[in-house]
Amino acid sequence: MATKCGKCGPGYPSPLEAMKGPREELVYLPCIYRNTGTEAPDYLATVDVNPKSPQYSQVIHRLPMPNLKDELHHSGWNTCSSCFGDSTKSRTKLLLPSLISSRVYVVDVATEPRAPKLHKVVEPEEIHAKCDLSYLHTSHCLASGEVMISALGDPRGNGKGGFVLLDGETFEVKGTWEQPGGAAPMGYDFWYQPRHNVMISTEWAAPNVLRDGFNPADVEAGLYGQHLYVWDWQRHERVQTLTLQDGLIPLEIRFLHNPAADQGFVGCALGSNIQRFYKNQGGTWSVEKVIQVPPKKVKGWILPEMPSLITDILLSLDDRFLYFSNWLHGDLRQYDISDPKRPRLVGQIFLGGSIVKGGPVQVLEDQELKCQPEPLVVKGKRVAGGPQMIQLSLDGTRLYVTTSLYSAWDKQFYPDLIREGSVMLQIDVDTVRGGLKLNPNFLVDFGKEPLGPALAHELRYPGGDCSSDIWL
């Protein structure tokens, strides 16, 4: 196992070896103040998740960024399991690309894991000048030792799905990963699978469209994404565009963790479905819808029909289970994907959402539920918002969940989330029969933060997790 290997690099030799890794004791997650009314910088929170610790389920450290209104969002590592064979590499820095300001913060989490400190700031001017890219999202480490970050647009806020390359040691901006002029029309997330010489990227919308909130008219105008882009991994060129039937706003994308696998899943937020992409015999790629969450007919909401809004998806390291969150409907789901063409629902839990009893929304017609779910109260705190970002323990038995999506959309869809702050919850997972159960003893209430209620987002463990590492 990698942790006992004197000559190995970061992470684990395989996803199945990673499942035997140590239990997580810390979680790092960005907390956002943009759009909350609190004039304070976003910060990286460190949460103690060791049940034996006296500080269990508490924020034990906060690292504020030096600027206001960055909109920290996702994070990634300087190096990970893609460099397992290189003993000169070690996972020491967490990179925090900013969705709005386009800064990249490099945080040292190795010197003192319980009290991270800022190592370097990559300013947007350098990224604009060298890449003509902006509005940064997903960060993945590469086997080359570089770090690759996806962009949603150009510095003027137009759609542009390109990729920034940073040196993994100095964090200097090296330029774009894609060939000059070869960016996709829009961008968001990406995942690569070198054994099949492929990368696939997704798209949200142009920054100018989504920055200040959601306008349904923009959907009608075709301004939101519904494509996957297939790239030649070695040539850095876009080779195929897949149009997603019913697949509006494809966000998070996950190949199966097995590096030999030639298929994976993407969650389509507004389409409220999961689509499977796969390689054909001729080497091209196709996509098919495998799960559809039906909308609910409602009264008292901005539209007469409420989509579930699938905002995050995750695969267990053994590729047995798919998890996803329905941010508006309020449920988190577990599917058995032993047969990836026919996912089977085996677990479901409601964690707030827009259709709870006693709320402003009345459900008129529901293809799935007989009655509206009860509001979620944990340790006396009524949970605002719905389940959003998720992270799974390496062994697959614990899910961590946060409730904020993106500050401008939080403000629009869940105003109480802005007033009361988001939460972090922990769900126990049955990996034998399937099933999800809330841990009633775990709650991190970001409504009680020292500077005011904060919006906590993506979750990371110090040693890598189920969405940070890619195996070769």
Swiss-Prot record:
Assembly notes: Interacts with USP33.
Record PTM N-acetylalanine, positions in chain: 2
Entry GO MF terms: methanethiol oxidase activity; selenium binding
PTM field: The N-terminus is blocked.
Any one of the GO CC terms: cytosol
Family membership: Belongs to the selenium-binding protein family.
Cellular localization per UniProt: Nucleus; Cytoplasm, Cytosol; Membrane
Function statement: Catalyzes the oxidation of methanethiol, an organosulfur compound known to be produced in substantial amounts by gut bacteria. Selenium-binding protein which may be involved in the sensing of reactive xenobiotics in the cytoplasm. May be involved in intra-Golgi protein transport.
Topology term for the membrane: Peripheral membrane protein
Pathway annotation from the record: Organosulfur degradation
GO BP, sorted A to Z: protein transport
Keyword Phosphoprotein: yes
Protein name: Methanethiol oxidase
Modified residues (Phosphoserine): 467
Keywords: Acetylation, Cytoplasm, Membrane, Nucleus, Oxidoreductase, Phosphoprotein, Protein transport, Selenium, Transport
InterPro entries, per the entry: Se-bd (IPR008826)
Gene symbol of the encoding locus: SELENBP1
Coiled coil segments of this chain: none
Record EC number: 1.8.3.4
Reaction it catalyzes: methanethiol + O2 + H2O = hydrogen sulfide + formaldehyde + H2O2 + H(+)
